[in-house]
Amino acid sequence: MASNANRRIRVTEYLDLELDREQWICNRCGHIFGSARDNYKKGCLIHDRDPREIHLPIVEGDYSFSPDPLWVRIVEFYCPGCGTQVDTEYLPPGHPLTHDIEIDIDALKSRLESGELVIKDQRLEAAQ
């Protein structure tokens, strides 16, 4: 079996999957967000931002072309270890956080162990 360094897969720009320990990891500082079988966002610092801070009004008045915070919220996710912004999502107020990355870890491990897939430079590739 490959070493732990070779069993880490880059999933997003700032998020890695450590396959042997089945954990989400910040690839900037190594902070562990939690189990890879759960939503990594639960391990992040969360900032619920007023959309008017990001999308400033274009004109004065009721119809300013700035999103209404009663209709939309901007949720920012940060690494507690280094402060890197890991993700952002736009949600209706009251909507639960999106569980947008769910990897079938057992199937992935099986395909790696069978030799069908390999990890090269933190990327999955088909075996040749």
Region spans (language model):
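Short recognition patches in nucleic-acid-associated and regulatory proteins
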Residues: M1-E13, N27, H31-D68, L91-P93, ...
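Short flanking/linker segments adjacent to small metal-binding domains or redox-active Cys/His motifs
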Residues: P80-T88, L124-Q128
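Extended aliphatic helical segments
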Residues: I9-V11, I58-V59, V72-V75, V86, ...
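Short metal-coordination and nucleic-acid-contact micro-motifs, chiefly zinc-binding Cys/His arrays
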Residues: L19-E22, V72-V75, I101
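Short, structured motif recognition centered on aromatic/hydrophobic residues
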Residues: Q23-N27, H31-A36, I74-F77, V86
